[in-house]
């Protein structure tokens, strides 16, 4: 029998590659024991990039979620790992050194064992400091090679990076094939090169299933020494996500590898529970197109997880481009026409901006440059005339060293615009920030939290954390969720049917008198404007719902009927209403 292969369930990435949000703390705590019961996973990806930010956007505390999800795995010896964007840590832009260092201390205390550190440019300068801080914080540093196909991304290129990372203290290497475009034979050779030189180094393969190469890649890397394979489970496996663990284990077992058995009863429970989370609310933010694989992405190399946002961008751009074409007397473009044009433009742009690996955030920059080029060429302005500072920052070297050469046209354009190229170590441009955030927390009377985790959260995601603390994030989220639900219903119902459906389980709150409506009153010294409540707000029976200023100058208190959840508002703060008008609808809790 061949060597033993272990498996990781990338539960965080399953959701990130499918939609906008992550499960709540209670949902994660509910499914963790079932994942353990499956018996086939030695690792689980519990948190990391995007996980914490979208928790805050949903009005939830990510620290509570991480602790609740990691704890059951810690108790049984299943290792937990997180995604770490190196210089950018958990967000999309650079993070000061002191905040990055604090992250590893906090995450280790919360129960995260391994940090997968990657840099979108494969610039080791953005990774190596994190290796040191991870070890100091008590975590295992696993360093990633961002896989792509280009003339500069050779076996020697990747081996040179692996050499530097291992010399700096990396204990594991991940082959991170985010777009799933790594050629299987190439990945097998790379795995063998690393294993032959560093037999003690653990190699973990992470490949998305988008263009259909990932199963062949898994077989190649395992036959050449890989130790651990990232997998998914239904209903979020395949498509633009990851291969399903059932298929991977079946393939490797028949190849002669030692693999664990799957408790299929537990698998079906985890499958049903994940579907339950989708049905409850997460599915309203999942693009159905992410369930579809596409070989079209092999040519341009863009990650499949971008397809949803990319198609939305194309939809808006198509109308603008077709308006221009109509004025010129040219034939309009279909979505398919425009998609192929975009893929072709990415293939044109990518080498000219130096072949940055097409992973977050550089895949977005290359896509956006290409999309803007399509528009400006239709306008007769040529290419590269609509690039923002983020796009230029990548080209100029402000995010790290670009693997290839920048096209002379762009070098000349940068000079004309007074932009300067740099090879500076990006993290040295940042100043420490924790003292400023401590001052802000002290002034607001906010606790630093267990192991300084709340301080870390503010420092990592300042805007989102402030909105979370004020309650605005939860209000915004519930309103977005209601809009998403209405949109889904509205796609199959007439407006009248939609209103009837929404109000079937709801009580109408009716104005008892005519007058002017007031949803709330502000206390002395409050500077926030009074506004109507957020959709989803909970009321108890008899609560004051709103107030009406009657024509005779007295306020009439309107009670919240039998209580429940606010589902629709028909009257804004300060508006005039008539007696008998419906102010809002409250949906009672199920008996």
Please report, for each region that a protein language model flagged, where it lies by residue.
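Active-site beta->alpha loop and helix N-cap motifs at the rims of alpha/beta catalytic domains
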Residues: 33, 48-163, 180-183
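Hydrophobic faces of well-ordered beta-strands that scaffold small-molecule active sites
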Residues: 5-13, 42-46, 78-85, 115-117, ...
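N-terminal amphipathic alpha-helix/helix-capping segment at the start of soluble metabolic enzymes
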Residues: 1-18, 66-71
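Terminal or standalone catalytic/regulatory effector modules within metabolic enzymes
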Residues: 36-54, 292-297, 301-507
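C-terminal helical cap(s) of enzyme catalytic domains, especially alpha/beta-barrels
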Residues: 237-262
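Catalytic cores of alpha/beta
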Residues: 153-165, 211-227
